[in-house]
Each structure stands twice: as structure tokens, then as C-alpha cells.
Amino acid sequence: MKFVSFNINGLRARPHQLEAIVEKHQPDVIGLQETKVHDDMFPLEEVAKLGYNVFYHGQKGHYGVALLTKETPIAVRRGFPGDDEEAQRRIIMAEIPSLLGNVTVINGYFPQGESRDHPIKFPAKAQFYQNLQNYLETELKRDNPVLIMGDMNISPTDLDIGIGEENRKRWLRTGKCSFLPEEREWMDRLMSWGLVDTFRHANPQTADRFSWFDYRSKGFDDNRGLRIDLLLASQPLAECCVETGIDYEIRSMEKPSDHAPVWATFRR
């Protein structure tokens, strides 16, 4: 069973990248983030013709997530319990039948946070991680197959930082988000529920693979970026992970997203 997570940075701007992902990877499940399209305007017909059940949770111009599944899900949930109409459309979940059992897939576009001293964005990021933590602890069991995927906007370890030592120190000094100590605490707490970072587990020493590259500084040309797009699997699912990677080929296409797709394959 193959999962692909991709921050598409505008679904209607990049159908060519989604088509390329389907053709190359033939995934069973695709999680898209930052679709940037209101539900009323979602290009359902165009996406469904790729051979998927399509579920989406979006708003005009910002944020937005979608799940594409080969198998028909048992259940789909949009947003966290307690989200109101004003909540940013950042998370969609599904329970999907498979040979691995019913897999709970949580696809999220996590807040970026901007910087420690931002009065709105940083607390919103902390709250989002707390909401996910609460959901795991109250709604799910760690001995069941669970996969959290998406643009999580945190680099879990220093191996996941590829912007140069000078920039790394400056970001920490100025409180810029992505690998602040507080953010690492949120991530560690999430992982301690019983999750495995599939890429890092398979590549414990790799320090030159990233998933986000800044457009402005042409970071992709020099492989300067951050690994912030993750697939986190519960232990029973992680034990079935046979392959995982970051697709630089898709990132190198014309008019690309600033993110590369990340993927993992599981077999019983």
C-alpha cells in the first residue's frame, strides 16, 4: 500500500504535477495540502478521472487539504472535533480498508507559525499540534494502523535542516519557525504517542534530502531546503514499511510547487 503526501501549493495551478505523481507512483492514497481552492470550486471531475475517490476540505485562496483514495473509505472526517465554521481548513482524515487492516489516515497542512513572537500565528501552530495530540489520545489506539502525513512545518532533527549553518543559527537567534526548541517539543510529544518517522527510520544518517525549497533563493538548484513534509506511522504500520523517499524528479518539473512529494510503501 503506497501513500504519497504533497503540498501542491495551488491545486488548479499544478494539475501536471498531480498527474505525474499518479503516473509514476500509482499510489493507493494521496494526501494534498495547500490546495487553495474553495469546496464549491474544487476541480472534482478532473481529479476523479485519475482513478480516485476524492474528498476535500478547503477555502478560497488559502490552506485546504484533499485525500484521494483507491479504496472507498469507511469514514471521512473534515477538521478536528470542535472546529467551527471559522476554523482554517487544514486537516482531513479517513479510515481506509486495506490488507494491513483499517488504516486511519490523517492528512494535515500544519500552520507555519512564522516566528516565536508572532502574536497570532505562533500560538495557532501550538494549538494545532495540541489539537492533534488530543485527537490521538482520545480517539485512536496506538496499536492500530495510523498514518499522519502532510506538510508539518517542523524539521524533526538537525539532519533535516539544509539551509546552511549560518542561516540555521540566525533562524534560531531570531525565533524564526521550523526547528525552534518549542516546535521540537511539540513534535517529540506527538511522536511519543507511538509514531515513527518513516523516512528517518529508513535513512538514519541521511542529511541531504529535503522536501521544501525556497523559490526566491532558488534553493532547489543547490539542494538547500528543509525536510518538513513527513509520513509518521504507528508502530504496527511502521513495521510494514518497505520503502520511503522524497521525489526530486517531480520537484524539478516546470512550474513546480516549492515542495517535493514524499512517499512510503507498506506491505504485510
Curated annotation (Swiss-Prot):
Protein name as annotated: Exodeoxyribonuclease III
Site (Transition state stabilizer): 153
Organism this protein belongs to: Escherichia coli (strain K12)
Superkingdom to which the source organism belongs: Bacteria
GO cellular component, one term: cytosol
Organism classification: Bacteria, Pseudomonadati, Pseudomonadota, Gammaproteobacteria, Enterobacterales
Stored Pfam families: Exo_endo_phos (PF03372)
Cofactor(s) in the UniProt record: Mg(2+); Mn(2+)
UniProt KW keywords: DNA damage, DNA repair, Exonuclease, Hydrolase, Magnesium, Metal-binding, Nuclease
